[in-house]
Each structure stands twice: as C-alpha cells, then as structure tokens.
Amino acid sequence: MQLEFLGTGAGSPGKFRNVTSTALRLLDERNEVWLFDVGEGTQHQILRTTLKPRKIAKIFITHLHGDHIFGLPGLLSSRSFQGGDEPLTIYGPVGVRDFVQTALRVSGTHLSYPLKFHEITKAETVFEDATFKVSCEPLDHRIACFGYRVEEADHPGELQADRLKALNIPSGPVYGQLKAGKTVTLPDGRTINGQDYIAAPQKGRTVTILGDTRRTPHAVSLAQDADALVHESTFGKDEGKLAHNYYHSTSTQAAQVAQQAGVKQLLLTHISARYTGKLSKELQKQAQKVFSHSKVVRDFDVIDIPLPEKG
C-alpha cells in the first residue's frame, strides 16, 4: 500500500505543484489504484509515473470545485484508449454524475467500460468488501465536501508451524487444514484444533484523505488512529483568519487534528502557491512543532504505508 501524490497545489496549477490528486496504490492488495480527486492535468502527471489508467478502479471526489474535478473527463476518456475495459466507479457529492455525463455527451466521448456513480449526501459507508471498507463524513467547506477513511481488513494470523513441528507433526496437507482452522485427527489418534495454532490476526492499515475544510470534529473522527492522514494545509499558522474566511486550514490546525486523532503520520497537501522553497519548509516546521511526524508532500512523492509491526 502506497500513497502517490499527483498534485499537491491549491486553486490552480502552478510551476511547482499541480492541482489536487492523490493515488492510493493497492497493487499488491487488489491489483488496483484508487484516485482521490482529479484536478486539471492529472493525466499528464500520471504520464510521469508508473501508474496505469487501466488499473484505476475507483475515483473518490471530495468536492466539486474545479481544482479537484476538471481532470476527470480527460482521464476517463484516456482510460478507454489505454486498454481500460473493467468497470470504474466514481464516488462524490451530488452533481458529479451530471458533470461527467455532460462533459462526455457534449464532447461525443464513448467509453469502452461501464462507468458507475455513487453520489453522497451524508456520512455513510460508500464501499465495503472482504478486504477494504471506505467511509465518508462531511467536512466544513464552502460547498458540500467530504473526507474519506479507507480501512483495510485485518490479515489472518499465520500458522505457528514451529509449534506443530515440536509436536512431531510433519508438514504436508494437514498444515493447510490446520491453517484453515479445522480440527484434524492424526494417524496416531491425536486430535489437533487448528485454531489453537494460529497466531493473532495482523491489524490492517487505515488511510484518511480529507478534502478542503476548516477545523471540524469530523476530521478527527475520520482520522482516528490512522496510519496516515492526508490533510490540506493551504495557509501558514499566521493566516488563521484568512483560512477561516476561505474555508481552509492552516499548517498548525492540520497538525492539531493529527495530534488529537492519534495518527502515525501527517501528510500536508493543497499548498498555496505563495509557499515555495523555504516557505514550504516553514509550513512543515510549523506543523512539526505541534505534531512531530508531519511532512509537506510534493508532486510525485510516494509514501509507503507498511503493515503495523507484529507484537
């Protein structure tokens, strides 16, 4: 599991940061990529990575401001040209279906794959299967905006083969039965319950990706105990009034959310073009004074989300 940042700027494309898009790489887990927001030029950014549009299975839109959605029609079209034929689902606020369908209709674009929509109006679980769950909650922005919490299911515990070998139980098909939790009767008459020889499950990972927002309790609940929190940091700590008026957050406000939620790392994005070079580093320092594991990410940064260490 990795996060790859395709655009980390705010408002409009800049020389050093494109507008918002974040890829959650789940290639090992399910051979898929999930995108969160698709700002203008996202497909150009993808060309500079190893990501393949045909691998994109889900797109989660936080809100319908242009710097988060203007790249959608082009990316959807290119996915057809590049061998994408598997269904793709777009999740987002009411209006995302109309935006996409209008752009495709007016441009005469025909997709080679089924396109589905799941429009959101309130906090809910938008997707869940045996391996992942995605839930959302509303944030505090000028228009309807949501944050997403991606939770990986726990990994089954490993079979404790060393304990079985200590009992003179040779490896073979019986190990597969025991790993499945079955009770097995051995040739010598002993009965072995597989459940007694399976280690505790390994906790799955949680990633929280927020849209544009002012401080809100929903940000904390979405991020609770997450392995990584992606939070906007449009302004520096001294611009609190400006951030409030424009429905955004400062570096220190984002860090306060991370601290309160008990996350493992805070990844700051949606950076105003005014913060370049040393000023960008200053944003990071501001956040680190509140929450030490803070990082201002740049376009094309790739962040590993490792499985928690086993106890």
UniProtKB/Swiss-Prot annotation:
Pfam families: Lactamase_B. GO terms for molecular function: 3'-tRNA processing endoribonuclease activity; zinc ion binding. The keyword rRNA processing does not apply. Keywords: Endonuclease, Hydrolase, Metal-binding, Nuclease, tRNA processing, Zinc. Zinc phosphodiesterase, which displays some tRNA 3'-processing endonuclease activity. Probably involved in tRNA maturation, by removing a 3'-trailer from precursor tRNA. Belongs to the RNase Z family. Zn(2+) 2 binds at D67, H68, D212, H270. PANTHER family: ZINC PHOSPHODIESTERASE ELAC PROTEIN 1. NCBIfam families: PRK00055.1-3, RNase_Z. Zn(2+) 1 binds at H63, H65, H141, D212. Its cofactor is Zn(2+). Signal peptide: none annotated. CDD domains: RNaseZ_ZiPD-like_MBL-fold. The active site is at D67 (proton acceptor). Homodimer. InterPro entries: Metallo-B-lactamas, RibonucZ/Hydroxyglut_hydro, RNase_Z/BN. This is Ribonuclease Z. It catalyses: Endonucleolytic cleavage of RNA, removing extra 3' nucleotides from tRNA precursor, generating 3' termini of tRNAs. A 3'-hydroxy group is left at the tRNA terminus and a 5'-phosphoryl group is left at the trailer molecule. Binds 2 Zn(2+) ions. Its EC number is 3.1.26.11.
